[in-house]
Amino acid sequence: LEVPELLAAPCPVVRFNAIVAGKYKLRILWELRAGAKRYSEIGRALQDATGGQPITPRVLSRELKELTVNELISRKQFPGVPPRVEYKLTPSGRALSGVLRAICRWGGPASV
């Protein structure tokens, strides 16, 4: 099934998985729980979380775009040179905070 079909699925678990499936999406949501972050800050946080393995700009951009399209995060561009972009959780994204905390508890203290 394609993602649009999965988003229309009657099962909420299938819909949730269609929205957050991806190598970094849950981690991005976790990083944004404390407030807005710039693109580069998110990239560094993900690199730190993966033991120094860098995330490619293409992959990070794709994950951020998909989270934005699914309205879990918002993107705000500020005028100026160089352009500055910040991402933050939307109300829908903030609603996942409890789920993310439960995942961290399940994963144990080393996961936080």
Annotate the PLM regions.
Residues L1-P12:
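Long, low-complexity, charged/polar intrinsically disordered regions in eukaryotic proteins
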Residues Q47-P82:
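Canonical helix-turn-helix DNA-binding module
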Residues N70, V99-S111:
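Alpha-helical linker/hinge and terminal dimerization helices associated
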Residues R15, G43-A45, V69, E86, ...:
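Non-catalytic interaction surface on structured domains
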